[in-house]
Structure formats: C-alpha cells, structure tokens
Regions:
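Charge-centric, low-complexity intrinsically disordered segments used as regulatory activation/interaction regions
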Residues: 1-11, 43, 137-158, 165, ...
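N-terminal domain-start signal
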Residues: 2-102
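Terminal, non-catalytic domain-edge segments
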Residues: 1-27, 188-253
C-alpha cells in the first residue's frame, strides 16, 4: 500500500499496520476452537473466526480479544490482529477498565514465541504506535494508556521509557505532564497506576525512579503547576519524609 506524504513516525506506523496485514493475512482460529455460547457468543460468530480476513463487527472483535479462555489464544489473536491493531490506533477499543486489558490479550498469545516474521511484525507495530503517540499532539489514545498496553503486551517497561526519554519535543513533554497528573495518586501510595499480571512491584519501582530522574526538567513548561512538580519530588522520598512533607497532598489510601 502507498501512503501520501506523512511525518516519519506516522509513515512508520502505517508501514507497521501494513506489515501486520501481510504477516497475518489468511490466518484463522484453530478449526476445533470453541467458546461458551451463553457467555461469549453464537456458533455463527465463532465460525467467523475460522474464516480468514473478513472484518468482525466491533462488538464481536471486543468479545474475541477480551475472552481469556480460548483453547488456542495465539491462533485467535493472529486471526484478529490486523483489525485489532487498527482499532487500537483509532481509539475505538473500549476495555472495561484500562487498556492494559488489551495488552494482556497480546501477552496471552505469547507472541514473542511466534515465528520470527510474525513476532517482528507485532514488535514493529507496538514500537511504531508508541513513537507515533508520543509525537502526536492529540493522539486518539492517551500516552499513559498506550504505555500500560505495550508494557503488559511485552512484559517489560524499559524500552518504552527509553523511547520517551529520547523524545524531548513539545508533544512528548505534554504527554508526560498528563501522565504524571494521572499517575501521581497511585504512585504516591506505592501502587502501579494500572493492573499488571506480573512484576508489578518491579514495574512500579522502575516507573517511579524514571519519573524522579526525568520528569522535573521536562515539566517546567508554561501551564504545568508547581504542585505537580512537588508530587514528582515526593516520589523520590519514602516513609515519614514523604507523608510529613509540607507539600503532601493529603491523599488517603
């Protein structure tokens, strides 16, 4: 597919979406795959997953990626990935709680263990979407939501923070301010700001340390409140030093 002139990160994302379509075109769920008609959907809907490349209606797509009990989640995920990824980028995926749920759907498929071409297509998409989000002044999905998804999908936070650290232009800093405002309550209570399947404490510790190191210099733009900077400073304190600081916001947990 050809694309009109676009910023490099947008072109990279378009190329990654095309790559998913190529890598997973023709894929279907396992012929013996099944699910509960009472709780998931009808036999006719299940049959759609066993036909390649036909578009699912949004509700069927949602029920498919959300279902935790497929016999072969990997084959189901491969069947829906091109459409699922496009819906994610457009912001049309609506989880019950947070977008980390969609990340866990990736994780349940163990995509990093797939054949190299398929795994690289997924990896390229996640990285391209993240870079595009950080450089877009008004992304369809907030950066803090995308970070939760890609972290859960990949079982690591490090590469995503590394990318954010290297992007120091205005949109990336604005997204950082928005994320800190969203996260500070949970992080000051020593809680990760999204539900995580594993390594929750390690992820929270890494995120907190990264914010303490990087956020202060990047949150001094006009419009960022001094109180938000104090919240970041408090993240670097522990115990009584944090709770008794004159700028402690009075959060109760």
């Amino acid at each position: 597919m050809t694309h009109p002139a676009q910023p490099p990160v947008r072109l990279r994302l378009a190329t990654a979406l095309d790559g998913l379509a190529v890598a997973f075109g023709g894929m279907t769920a396992h012929p013996d795959e099944h699910n509960c008609e009472c709780h998931w959907g009808s036999a006719e809907e299940l049959a759609q997953l066993k036909v390649p490349d036909t578009e699912l209606d949004p509700d069927l797509l949602r029920r498919t990626w959300q279902a935790p009990d497929w016999s072969d989640h990997a084959s189901v995920l491969r069947r829906i990935l091109p459409q699922f990824a496009t819906a994610l980028v457009k912001g049309s995926v609506e989880p019950l709680f947070g977008l980390e749920e969609a990340g866990r759907s990736f994780a349940r498929g163990h995509w990093q263990q797939w054949p190299t071409v398929q795994a690289e297509a997924v990896r390229d998409f996640l990285h391209a979407w993240w870079a595009d989000t950080l450089t877009d002044p008004d992304p369809a999905v907030p950066a803090y939501e995308v970070l939760a998804l890609v972290t859960e999908a990949s079982a690591t936070l490090t590469p995503w923070l590394t990318t954010w650290e290297t992007l120091t232009d205005h949109p990336a800093d604005d997204h950082l301010a928005e994320a800190v405002a969203k996260w500070e309550y949970d992080l000051l209570g020593d809680q990760l700001p999204w539900d995580s399947w594993e390594n929750e404490e390690e992820t929270r510790t890494e995120l907190t340390a990264w914010l303490v190191r990087n956020a202060p210099a990047r949150l001094r733009a006009p419009g960022v409140s001094g109180e938000l900077l104090h919240r970041v400073r408090l993240l670097g304190l522990t115990g009584d030093d944090r709770w008794e600081d004159p700028h402690w916001p009075g959060h109760r947990y």
